[in-house]
């Protein structure tokens, strides 16, 4: 599992993706608007522009039908708000600057105590394992000696 800073970075990147995707959907669903002084586009004549403007509402209706079925604004607002809550939670879980030295010292002391306890347990397990190994080797030696004695007596 990633540390808190990496989680925070991933969540901020995810939030940026949500913003970019929502802007893309807005651009895709938006209706063209007119600007004063820019009524003629490129090399189109006024008649071509009128014909294009008449076709535009039909195209918009065709494009908006499937998009109205899917509620993109609701989806992205939910995603963005959830992500913002996650970011807030991750930020709150980070250690504060004032108590970071004290917390680090306490944490290190606790870790050292746990490490010492684990080392003692490990040493005890190793000691028991070595005793068990000696017993097994002695038993195997006795078995081997017994087999040799049986072969020579036959």
From Swiss-Prot:
Region (Disordered): 37-71
Protein name from the UniProt record: Mediator of RNA polymerase II transcription subunit 21
Cell location: Nucleus
Organism of derivation: Anopheles gambiae
Biological processes, Gene Ontology terms: regulation of transcription by RNA polymerase II
Keywords associated with the record: Activator, Coiled coil, Nucleus, Transcription, Transcription regulation
Superkingdom in the source lineage: Eukaryota
Annotated Low complexity bias: 44-71
